[in-house]
Amino acid sequence: VEIEFESNPYIAISYHIPAVGHPDLYALDVLSSLLSDGRTSRLYKSMIEDKRIAVMAHAYDEISKYPDTFTFLAAPRAPHTVAEVESAIYEEIEKLKNAPPSDWELQKIKNQLEADFIRDLNSASGLANEIGHFEVLSDWRYINTFLDKVAQVTAEDVMGVAMKYFTKNNRTVAILVKKENNTKIKETKENNRPEKSTVTY
C-alpha cells in the first residue's frame, strides 16, 4: 500500500506472526532485539552508521492474544529513497536466513533482555504493569517463565524463525510518500514486490 501525504518518506514492512503462547515468539523477541536494540544492533549499524541511508531503522514484534505482526520501520536519509532502505532491510533479512548470530551476539541480546525485564520489576508500579501485561495477553504466570524461555533460545532458533516468517508471501508493505515524490518512488520500486494501491490524503 502506498499513501501520499504531506510528510517525509517512511516505510513499514510487516510479517505475520502467531499469537501469544506459540513457542516461536521467544526467538522472535530475541530477533527483534538483535535487529534494533541500541547502537550496536544490526539495523542501526548497517543502515544508519555504515551505509548512512536512513535516519531511523527499527524492528519490533507485536505480541497479542491474536496473530499479529513483526514490523520493520525505516525513514530514508535525503537524498536516499524509500526503495533503497527497503532493499537494505531485505539484505539484513537474507543475512539472518543464511547465517545464525554469533554466540557473543546472542548472549549480548539475552543479557539486554534480562536486564530490561528485571529493571521493569524493580518497582511496585513496574511489577504491577508487567503482571497486568501478561494477564491481558494470556496468563500473568508467564512472568515466571519468560526469562527461562529466552535463555533457551539458540542461534539456530533465531535463524529458523527468520526463514519461517520473513517471506514475500507473508508480508505487507506500506509506504508513506510526499505527493511530489510519488512518481520517482514508483519508478524505483523493487521488481519482486506486488503492485501497490495508492491512497491520497
Model-derived regions: residue spans:
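M16 family metallopeptidases and their MPP-like homologs
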Residues: 8-19, 45-151, 171-177, 184-187
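Helical mechanochemical/support elements of P-loop NTPase systems and associated helical scaffolds
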Residues: 39, 81, 154-157
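Proteolytic maturation boundary segments
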Residues: 1-2, 145-201
